[in-house]
């Protein structure tokens, strides 16, 4: 079985931006993050489960989309730790003779491959209280590289034994995995395609890696700018003309723009669009009143 663990709401920084939503429901490239996460497992012939907070209300659109994707929702009691949440989900739905894959809801990879028992790891990118790969994990490696963190994707050949290990480790998910590895050692897979959506700063950085361009547009993001060109030259020239003729009084509301004959570069701002906030967020009405003032 495949389990995406998204049973805890995103942090307060995300609540300020989008309202109260679980990490798998964050907007990414005109979709929700869960659509990209599920796509990673398209060639796995396994049942798919997504855990959510018990009081989270699914929209009709998300209900329909998740049904189309053959994903079963597991509503988990609020305020459980990660280890408690995983044990709850596995006790509800796991077939213990099947292999188990776990992907954290605030995690995405451009590429993902597993071994029988494996941990995806990545080099640390931000100053945060990460779960590090240390010598308490039993692996075939003789030495463990410094500054490697658990990147949020795991495979287990014996899920029932994993439950036992987590429970005996006072429901600590990480300590439970360390105990599990004493019997079933983990292969370590260093994955440089990891994108983190657990911190608001890394969220905006990760968003840049997923393009929203249409087929006739070319978009490149680098050095703080988005360069846009297109095979539809009339459209690009019309956009350049719009920027060139913008009244100076409005410059404080627009990003910096560098225009060329057949393309332009626009400053990349770490802001969400109104479309993302409206379609994917759960903002209260008073926030929208303030926006439109």
What does each model-found stretch correspond to?
Residues 214-245, 251, 260-262, 267-268, ...:
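ATP-binding glycine-rich loop module of kinase domains
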């Amino acid at each position: 079985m495949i389990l995406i663990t998204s049973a805890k709401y995103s942090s307060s920084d995300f609540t300020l931006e989008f309202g109260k939503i679980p990490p798998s429901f964050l907007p990414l490239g005109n979709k929700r993050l869960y659509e990209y996460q599920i796509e990673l497992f398209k060639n796995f012939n396994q049942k798919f489960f997504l855990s959510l907070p018990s009081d989270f209300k699914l929209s009709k659109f998300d209900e329909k989309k998740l049904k189309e994707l053959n994903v079963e929702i597991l509503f988990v009691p609020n305020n459980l730790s990660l280890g408690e949440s995983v044990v709850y989900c596995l006790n509800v739905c796991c077939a213990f003779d099947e292999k188990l894959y776990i992907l954290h809801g605030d995690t995405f990879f451009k590429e993902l491959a597993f071994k029988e028992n494996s941990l995806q790891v990545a080099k640390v990118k931000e100053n945060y209280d990460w779960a590090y790969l240390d010598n308490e994990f039993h692996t075939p490696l003789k030495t463990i590289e410094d500054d490697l963190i658990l990147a949020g994707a795991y495979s287990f050949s014996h899920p029932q034994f994993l439950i036992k290990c987590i429970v005996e480790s006072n429901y600590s998910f990480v300590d439970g995995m360390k105990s599990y590895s004493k019997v079933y050692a983990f292969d370590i897979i260093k994955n440089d395609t990891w994108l983190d959506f657990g911190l608001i700063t890394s969220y905006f950085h990760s968003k840049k890696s997923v393009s929203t361009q249409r087929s006739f547009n070319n978009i490149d993001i680098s050095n703080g700018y988005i360069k846009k060109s297109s095979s539809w030259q009339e459209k690009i020239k019309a956009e350049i003309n719009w920027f060139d003729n913008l009244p100076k009084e409005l410059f404080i509301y627009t990003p910096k723009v560098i225009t060329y004959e057949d393309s332009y570069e626009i400053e990349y701002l770490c802001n969400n669009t109104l479309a993302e906030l409206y379609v994917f967020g759960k903002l209260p009405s008073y926030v929208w009143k303030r926006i439109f003032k």
